[in-house]
């Protein structure tokens, strides 16, 4: 067997993450024993440790890479030796590759993950006008992916309109055109009704946040509907959309493809997407 792979996930509230299992199973299937550790700063072992201390510890211990999640995707940037152009433009990193010399490079596979999910799940979707509900969390990555995968006009709706406009400014600067505008999420249903598609980028639909981020009565069979939530896979939003006959994109595609792209960066190996999907869905 070849050299083993040591990976980790730094963030808060990581107990339900399916990423460790996907990486460990894929590494083993490729003949590389893989250990993927949760490094939870709300947990007993890493509690109270700052991000730099945890990153340094990973370097000293010979980690091959780290995934970074809430609340550290922005804070990690200045601690890295190098950051990809895309991640720099977005101001967010979710994947850190550590080479044999300890050199760290940051990437954002949330963007590529959502983009690949769109290509796979909505290959023929109309993209002239799209609404994204939610500007926090993975919102910047989703917006960037939408605009770079053919969306001509993207309206990002949030209850905090300043946050929505700040996201729009970041994406517009990154892509070099006025593709995104931030809008108020209150009364967004009229805007959605006139759009081609809508993406939920809020936590609404998760067990802790039941319901939908907007009134689904604005949807028709001509809309396509995406959701970043993957627990449950069929959210209330997607259930309502499918009942209308809408094309839909569930949150599993982004979750799986971000891990697929990260595994490739960590190891230099070509992951088997179907196998990683099978692992994800088995959990």
Swiss-Prot record:
InterPro entries: Aminoacid_DH-like_N_sf (IPR046346), NAD(P)-bd_dom_sf (IPR036291), SDH_C (IPR041121), Shikimate_DH-bd_N (IPR013708), Shikimate_DH_fam (IPR022893). Homodimer. Its EC number is 1.1.1.-, 1.1.1.24. It is an enzyme of class 1 (oxidoreductase). Induction: By shikimate, quinate and QsuR. GO terms for biological process: amino acid biosynthetic process; aromatic amino acid family biosynthetic process; chorismate biosynthetic process; shikimate metabolic process. Keywords: Amino-acid biosynthesis, Aromatic amino acid biosynthesis, NAD, Oxidoreductase. Belongs to the shikimate dehydrogenase family. It comes from the Bacteria. Coiled coil: none annotated. This is Quinate/shikimate dehydrogenase (NAD(+)). Pathway: Metabolic intermediate biosynthesis; chorismate biosynthesis; chorismate from D-erythrose 4-phosphate and phosphoenolpyruvate: step 4/7; Aromatic compound metabolism; 3,4-dihydroxybenzoate biosynthesis; 3-dehydroquinate from D-quinate (NAD(+) route). L-quinate binds at residues 17-19, 69, 73, 94, 110, 258. It catalyses: L-quinate + NAD(+) = 3-dehydroquinate + NADH + H(+); shikimate + NAD(+) = 3-dehydroshikimate + NADH + H(+). Optimum pH is 9-10. One of its GO terms (cellular component) is cytosol. GO terms for molecular function: NAD+ binding; NADP binding; quinate 3-dehydrogenase (NAD+) activity; shikimate 3-dehydrogenase (NAD+) activity; shikimate 3-dehydrogenase (NADP+) activity. The keyword Amino-acid biosynthesis applies. It holds the Pfam family SDH_C. The active site is at 73 (proton acceptor). The keyword Amino-acid biosynthesis applies. The lineage of its organism: Bacteria, Bacillati, Actinomycetota, Actinomycetes, Mycobacteriales. It comes from Corynebacterium glutamicum (strain ATCC 13032 / DSM 20300 / JCM 1318 / BCRC 11384 / CCUG 27702 / LMG 3730 / NBRC 12168 / NCIMB 10025 / NRRL B-2784 / 534).
């Amino acid at each position: 067997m070849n050299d083993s792979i040591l990976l980790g996930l730094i963030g808060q509230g990581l107990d339900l993450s399916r990423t460790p299992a996907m990486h460990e199973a894929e590494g083993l299937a490729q003949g590389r024993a893989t250990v993927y550790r949760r490094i939870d700063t709300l947990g007993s072992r890493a509690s109270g440790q700052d991000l730099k201390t945890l990153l340094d510890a990973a370097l000293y211990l010979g980690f091959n890479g780290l995934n970074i999640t809430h609340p550290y995707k922005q804070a990690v940037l200045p601690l890295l030796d190098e950051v990809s152009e895309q991640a720099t433009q977005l101001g967010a990193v979710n994947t850190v590759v550590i080479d044999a010399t300890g050199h760290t490079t940051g990437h954002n596979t949330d963007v590529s993950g959502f983009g690949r999910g769109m290509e796979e799940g909505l290959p023929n979707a109309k993209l002239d006008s799209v609404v994204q509900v939610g500007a926090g969390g993975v919102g910047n990555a989703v917006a960037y992916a939408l605009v770079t995968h053919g969306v001509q006009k993207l309206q990002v709706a949030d209850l905090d309109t300043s946050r929505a406009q700040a996201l729009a400014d970041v994406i517009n600067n990154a892509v070099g055109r006025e593709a995104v505008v931030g809008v108020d999420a209150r009364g967004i249903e009229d805007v959605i009704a006139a759009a081609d598609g809508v993406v939920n980028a809020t936590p609404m639909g998760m067990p802790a946040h039941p319901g939908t981020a907007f009134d689904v009565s604005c949807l028709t069979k001509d809309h396509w509907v995406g959701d970043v939530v993957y627990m449950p896979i069929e959210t209330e939003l997607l259930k309502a959309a499918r009942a209308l006959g809408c094309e839909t994109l569930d949150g599993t595609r982004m979750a799986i493809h971000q891990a697929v792209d990260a595994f490739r960066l960590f190891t230099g190996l070509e992951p088997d997407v179907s196998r990683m999907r099978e692992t994800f869905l088995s959990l």
